[in-house]
Curated annotation (Swiss-Prot):
It comes from the Viruses. It comes from Acholeplasma phage L2. May be a DNA-binding protein involved in virion nucleoprotein condensation. One of its GO terms (molecular function) is DNA binding. This is Uncharacterized 17.2 kDa protein. Keywords: DNA-binding.
Amino acid sequence: MARSKKGKNLIYVLLGLVGLLAFFVLFVPTLTISASTPVWLENTITYATSFRDAFNVSGMVYMVILLGVLIAYLLLKYSKTRQNKDALKVVLAVVIAFAVYLLFTPALAAAFSDQVWLVDFSKLATDITSFIDTNNGFLTIIAGLGALTFFIVKKSK
């Protein structure tokens, strides 16, 4: 009982963080900058606007990232042995963290382009999203074959 309540609380915290991020990205850029606007708010509005404008990941990138997280979740859900569950939970957490890295760091690097460490940190994510955009037809075929194989194997058991 306590474990499921802890999981629900974690989900609520994550939903709250996503809501705050959505508020920040959607509402803050609509504020107008006037002569009486403090410098920190002016900088916040500028950064939020550039982040929103730079967050232009294609739909294929979303699908590939969602598919990767879904595969990791299905591996966790359908694992037969109890010994693998802990390792697969770690794998799922790593996949989710990498998905967040792929989605957010290129936009953050574009918004804060003066931060060299952030631009360097997001280079891998930018390269991966560019690769997904370039090879989206091939990746769609591979994903379709993988899903078909999963359902055939699951149905045969």
